[in-house]
């Protein structure tokens, strides 16, 4: 597949072999066409995940969707689609499993007798404000449950659709129950359209952060992932733009290509930026000990070697210049009204 055959609107340019299946069919380049999204309703028995990773700052996460229409070529969550019998490639962004019973399951979780409330992260795996949310409103219904039970929630998204729920955020913020962060890995619109094709533009995300902050909502941003040779030269510019919105904090991660993310991303590079492919792959390996992936706790986010160190130093320059006196707002579970009373029963 040549660069002229890059499929617009898709991060993955093809499906890749499922690690758990013995056989697979890989189509020829000429067979691959843009695929329409298929929505699949699933019926989980539980909805809140206990986060046990020592390098993550949350104890619970909740994912209303499995798979993500945003189509980010680098997404670390792609391999999770293989557990459902799908591919981490095109399937991940075109076969979306939706959990319409998530709000009801969340209420059942809240009224457990021994539940101790702690901030729940939306989503942690796939984006809770991906395009289908505009129609289904599962995330909004989840927020309504959290407001009713006065339970704290932190949100991370790549979509300015978060503004739709500003009315709920304002009410939740009266009890210190909400924080909202947006991920902005590039200001280059051409790169964004190819790399994360169905996310909001950087301009729209920055405007959303500004509006949220004007309404006193705690906000933050992630520069994620930083990819040497693609967006690493934008870091200081992005930090400055984030600071101008009034955001309380920013964070970042370095790219890692674990498992089947690797063939998806490499094929994307080949079709989107063939002239940069070898350089980008080489730079990633230089900060990943000769590999493209990394699963070790803590190491997976910070990398190693001179390339990673240069990125870290640039980040610190930006932090000291633009975020010196800012910090993340700590949310409160002091007003939680779930397991103690069990009186609401929204469903």
Predicted features along the sequence, with ranges:
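Conserved Radical SAM active-site core
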Residues: 27-66, 73-181, 185-193, 201-214
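Active-site glycine- and acidic-residue-rich loops that bind
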Residues: 160-163, 227-236
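Basic (Lys/Arg-enriched) interaction patch that binds polyanionic ligands
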Residues: 68-70, 225
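Conserved strand-turn element in the central/C-terminal portion of the radical SAM core barrel
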Residues: 187-189, 195-198, 211-231, 254-257, ...
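Auxiliary Fe-S-binding modules of radical SAM enzymes
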Residues: 1-43, 211, 233-347
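Hydrophobic anchor at the start of a short beta-strand
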Residues: 153, 219, 250
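Glycine-enriched alpha-helix->loop->beta-strand junction motifs that scaffold or abut catalytic
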Residues: 174-177, 218, 244-248
């Amino acid at each position: 597949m040549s660069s002229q055959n890059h499929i617009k609107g898709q991060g993955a340019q093809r499906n890749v072999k499922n690690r758990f299946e013995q056989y697979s069919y890989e189509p020829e380049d000429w067979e691959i066409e843009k695929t329409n999204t298929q929505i699949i309703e699933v019926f989980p028995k539980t909805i809140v995940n206990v986060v046990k990773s020592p390098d993550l700052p949350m104890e619970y996460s909740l994912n209303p969707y499995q798979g993500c229409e945003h189509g980010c070529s680098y997404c670390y969550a792609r391999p999770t689609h293989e557990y459902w019998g799908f591919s981490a490639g095109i399937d991940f962004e075109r076969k979306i499993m939706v959990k319409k019973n998530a709000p009801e399951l969340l209420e059942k979780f809240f009224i457990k007798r021994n539940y101790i409330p702690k901030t729940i992260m939306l989503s942690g795996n796939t984006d809770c404000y991906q395009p289908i949310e505009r129609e289904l409103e599962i995330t909004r219904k989840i927020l309504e449950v959290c407001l009713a039970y006065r339970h704290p929630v932190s949100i991370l998204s790549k979509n300015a659709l978060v503004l739709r729920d500003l009315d709920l955020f304002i009410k939740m913020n009266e009890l210190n129950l909400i924080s909202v962060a947006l991920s902005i890995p590039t200001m280059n619109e051409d790169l964004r359209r190819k790399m994360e094709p169905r996310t909001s533009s950087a301009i729209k995300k920055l405007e959303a952060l500004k509006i949220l902050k004007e309404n006193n909502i705690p906000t933050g941003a992630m520069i994620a992932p930083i990819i040497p040779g693609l967006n690493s030269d934008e870091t200081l510019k992005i930090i400055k733009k984030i600071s101008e919105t009034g955001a309380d904090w920013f964070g970042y991660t370095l790219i890692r290509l674990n498992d089947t993310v690797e063939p998806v991303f490499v094929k994307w590079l080949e079709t989107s930026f063939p002239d940069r492919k070898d350089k980008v792959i080489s730079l990633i390996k230089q900060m990943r000990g000769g590999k493209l992936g990394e699963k070790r706790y803590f190491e997976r986010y910070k990398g190693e070697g001179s390339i990673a160190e240069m990125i870290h130093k640039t980040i610190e320059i930006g932090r000291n210049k633009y975020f010196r006196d800012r910090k993340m707002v700590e949310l409160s579970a002091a007003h939680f009204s779930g397991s103690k009373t069990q009186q609401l029963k929204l469903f």
